[in-house]
């Protein structure tokens, strides 16, 4: 008994296990799927196995649902599913042979194209040859939509009224596109429906009024015959819109004709008879009528029973109450009969383009397309200060619609256009110094992401200096000599023109030589600086580098001369802090040229100088004569001649020598050399000895550094760094810097003391300047500020920092060379052996 139960349970278990295994295998892998994948792999192998081995995984399109399709990837070893993914055929297409997805644009471009010879056809590129496909009748292929679309009803038709045939009724009234032959009834038209085509290709289906039939030959609605079976003289209650106030319609010989009342009578449409009265007498205010002596666009409107007003319209129509009224749009008045299209065109000095289109029908506006003409460069600022003086639109009209404006659909009338710079602190107008080229605009609107807009702007500029001109006419691009009362080029500031008040002729041409520069704030355009040698001149030939070189610095190492600020300051300091050994008194304030190099053009004669070593000692027993005629003279042994004591033709070296505390300036003359010995045999060449190091300069004041801050080729500021090569002066500088005197109102600007003659406007009408007053370095409040600035942080009126040696932080002001300035600690690491002096070349020279 137990054995039978066990056998039954075992049988049930086996049946369940077999069923589960079967279902698992069935759902996991059915025979149909196996067959499909086997066919897919077989097809793939046949077409590709000659080129490459069978891959481990193959994908194929397994399901399609409208635009969505599924790509199934399976293992080629056992045909089991590897992966599935969902895709959109509007975005990408699966390439079976290459086992890759390709963008739709590329597929369409490669596989589908329109047939230029027949708009009803399109061409498919097959694997072996092209295949021409046809759209249904009255359909054309639209490549943009990649499908066949109905031919517009007004295709190739001018504006006007057209009869409705069977095909038009099917498509426009019944809204059905049937693929059938309409040639059998091609001559039949609907009696009252007609097609109105507009100038822009649009259409409308309209119907004639009651008692009217559309005449296909004339293209107008004509009234039906109203006098059929009516006697002659029968007056009709039919009043066409062009019927005058004294006219009526009557029947004659079975046809309706216009009848007319006797003179001085009107036809009363209420009484249906001619009466002798004013047209307004029976109808009152608001009644309208027309007479033979007014125009086609005019009518009379009754003000009361005996007065009327003449109304002039753009277009006269009659409303549903049989009263005249005005209609139409004034914009259509220039079109013939108020019907047609007008393409608007924008033209200025630089470009021209179509900006829109107006379509009218019977003086009514059907379509008014206005493209977006807002300037794409309206808010564009190049290099933070330049604007294009050109109105380049956002959109243009291409004949059918507004499209984005490009270099291809905008016509350039000139090769150059004006460039404007935003207002600046110095009032510099650069529109005559450079012009933009049309290639710049083409590059800017092409949306080339490989270059930024500033780089494109700088690359396509035309400079006045390129044409060897002081300026270019912003409107014609031709060289000019005047543009207002003066003309200069900030990119080539070697010259300038001063013109008459009308700006028509040159009064004076300035060529700036050594010691002169262009001062844009001066009426004379000339500034003076003895050290300046056109150091700010731009040497670049690359146009892009020229405009990018807005702010730069020139450094020049030169000598301290007796006439410059270094000599004045250091001489004063030296004489103040130097004392005589015997009396410990301050040396007299006398400048004697002992501190600096002798100017090149000052001659020193031997009779007025004494050698330091020739000074007579106080304890000398005897005083030797300056010149002893009996002293043994050197002679020339070769010719037994006596050499002169002074030979003006003798070659000698002289050193201009000076020493602190000396009595005067001295020439130290090298003693005459003996005659050269007889030539000896040339010795063997020896290695060249190393050059001896240069001896240090014997001068206390030797070198100075000049730093010019340039705005393009115009110098704005000059920083002089005076080298101190004497311990007395170095100690004096340190003492002065440790004992700076500051006015109370200039406490915020106390750090101007690092650089003499530095100026800062601290607001509230207070201007502070650093100076050396002969006793101490002071930061003093000026009685009247030299300059007042709107922006205290930049010390300018346009928010641009021009003075690179003046620093502002948290309301405090400091003058310091850039390389010595510590912005984090607001500190100037000033050098103990240098004195700095700042010149504002543009502003201070005109104060």
From Swiss-Prot:
List S-S links within the chain.
Answer: 208-221, 261-274
Q: Which residues are glycosylated?
A: 156, 211, 306, 337, 500, 592, 613, 639
Disulfide bond: present as a keyword of the record? yes
MF terms (GO), sorted A to Z: chitin binding; zinc ion binding
Q: Which SMART domains match?
A: ChtBD2 (SM00494)
Q: Where is the Chitin-binding type-2 domain?
A: 224-282
Give a yes or no for keyword Disulfide bond in this entry. Answer: yes
GO cellular component labels: extracellular region; virion component
UniProt-annotated stretches for the region Disordered: 665-698
Q: Which residues form the signal peptide?
A: 1-19
Principal cellular location given in the protein's record: virion
- Acidic residues: bias regions: 681-693
Q: Where's it found, cell-wise? A: Virion
Give the keywords, sorted.
Chitin-binding, Disulfide bond, Glycoprotein, Metal-binding, Repeat, Signal, Virion, Zinc, Zinc-finger
The task this protein performs is described as: Plays an essential role in nucleocapsid assembly. Essential for the establishment of efficient per os infection.
Name of the protein this chain belongs to: Capsid-associated protein AC83
């Amino acid at each position: 008994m137990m054995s039978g139960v066990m056998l039954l349970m075992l049988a049930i278990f086996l049946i369940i296990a077999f069923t589960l295994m079967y279902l698992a295998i069935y759902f996991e892998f059915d025979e149909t799927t196996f067959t499909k994948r086997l066919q897919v792999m077989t097809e793939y192998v046949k077409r590709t196995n000659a080129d490459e081995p069978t891959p481990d995984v193959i994908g194929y399109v397994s399901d399609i649902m409208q635009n969505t399709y599924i790509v199934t990837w399976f293992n080629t070893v056992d045909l089991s599913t590897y992966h599935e993914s969902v895709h959109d055929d509007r975005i990408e297409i699966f390439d079976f042979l290459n086992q890759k997805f390709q963008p739709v644009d590329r597929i369409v471009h490669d596989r589908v194209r329109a047939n230029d010879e027949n708009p009803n056809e399109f061409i498919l590129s097959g694997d072996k040859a092209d295949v021409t496909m046809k759209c249904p009748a009255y359909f054309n292929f639209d490549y943009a939509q990649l499908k066949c679309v109905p031919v517009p009803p007004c295709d190739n038709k001018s504006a006007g009224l057209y009869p409705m045939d069977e095909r038009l009724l099917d498509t426009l009234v019944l809204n059905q596109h049937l693929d059938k032959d309409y040639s059998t009834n091609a001559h039949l038209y609907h009696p009252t429906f007609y097609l109105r085509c507009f100038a822009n290709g649009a259409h409308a289906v309209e119907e004639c009024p009651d008692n009217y039939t559309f005449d296909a030959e004339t293209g107008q609605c004509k009234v039906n015959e109203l006098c059929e079976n009516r006697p002659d003289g029968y007056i009709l209650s039919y009043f066409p819109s062009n019927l005058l106030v004294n006219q009526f319609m009557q029947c004659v010989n079975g046809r309706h004709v216009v009848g007319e009342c006797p003179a001085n009578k009107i036809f009363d449409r209420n009484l249906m008879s001619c009466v002798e009265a004013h047209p307004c007498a029976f109808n009152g205010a608001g009644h309208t009528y027309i007479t033979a002596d007014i125009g086609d666009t005019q009518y009379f409107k009754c003000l009361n029973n005996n007065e009327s007003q003449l109304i002039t319209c753009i277009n006269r129509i009659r409303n549903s109450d049989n009263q005249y009224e005005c209609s139409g749009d004034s914009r259509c008045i220039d079109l013939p009969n108020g019907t047609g299209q007008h393409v608007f065109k924008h033209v200025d000095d630089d470009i021209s383009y179509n900006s829109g289109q107006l379509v009218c029908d019977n003086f009514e506006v059907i379509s008014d397309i206005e493209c977006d003409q807002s300037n794409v460069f309206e808010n564009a600022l190049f290099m933070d200060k330049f604007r294009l003086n050109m109105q380049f639109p956002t959109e243009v009209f291409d004949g059918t619609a507004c499209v984005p404006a490009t270099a291809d659909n905008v016509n350039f009338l000139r090769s150059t256009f004006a460039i404007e710079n935003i207002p600046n602190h110095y009032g510099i107008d650069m529109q005559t110094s450079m012009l933009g080229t049309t290639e710049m605009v083409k590059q800017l609107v092409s949306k080339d992401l490989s270059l930024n807009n500033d780089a494109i702007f700088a690359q396509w500029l035309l400079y006045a200096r390129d044409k060897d001109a002081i300026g270019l006419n912003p409107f014609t691009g031709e060289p000019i000599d005047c543009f207002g009362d003066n003309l200069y080029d900030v990119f080539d500031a070697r010259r300038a023109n001063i013109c008459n008040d009308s700006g028509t002729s040159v009064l004076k041409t300035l060529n700036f030589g050594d010691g002169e520069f262009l001062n844009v704030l001066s009426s004379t355009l000339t500034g003076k600086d003895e050290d300046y040698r056109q150091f700010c001149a731009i040497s670049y030939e690359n146009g892009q580098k020229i405009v990018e070189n807005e702010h730069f610095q020139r450094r020049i190492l030169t000598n301290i001369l007796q006439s410059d600020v270094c000599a004045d300051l250091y001489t004063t300091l030296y004489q103040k802090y130097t004392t005589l050994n015997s009396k410990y008194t301050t040396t007299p304030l006398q400048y004697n040229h002992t501190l600096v190099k002798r100017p090149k053009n000052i001659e020193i004669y031997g009779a007025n100088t004494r050698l330091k070593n020739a000074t007579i000692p106080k304890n000398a027993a005897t005083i030797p004569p300056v010149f002893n005629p009996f002293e043994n003279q050197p002679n020339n042994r070769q010719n037994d001649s006596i050499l002169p004591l002074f030979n003006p033709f003798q070659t000698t070296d002289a050193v201009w020598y000076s020493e602190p505390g000396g009595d005067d300036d001295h020439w130290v003359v090298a003693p005459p050399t003996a005659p050269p010995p007889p030539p000896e045999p040339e010795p063997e060449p020896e290695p060249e000895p190393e050059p001896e190091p240069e001896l240090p300069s014997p001068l206390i004041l030797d070198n100075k550094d000049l730093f010019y801050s340039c705005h393009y080729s115009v110098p704005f500021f000059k920083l002089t760094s005076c080298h101190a090569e004497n311990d007395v002066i170095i100690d004096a500088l340190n003492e002065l810097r440790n004992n700076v005197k500051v006015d109370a109102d200039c406490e915020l600007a106390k750090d101007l003391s690092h650089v003499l003659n530095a100026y800062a406007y601290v607001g509230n009408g207070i201007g502070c300047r650093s100076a050396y007053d002969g006793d101490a370095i002071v930061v003093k409040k000026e009685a009247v500020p030299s300059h007042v600035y709107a922006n205290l942080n930049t010390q300018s009126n346009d928010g641009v920092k021009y003075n690179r040696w003046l620093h502002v932080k948290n309301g405090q002001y400091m003058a310091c060379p850039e390389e010595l300035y510590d912005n984090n600690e607001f500190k100037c690491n000033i050098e103990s052996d240098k004195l700095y002096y700042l010149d504002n070349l543009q502003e201070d020279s005109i104060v």
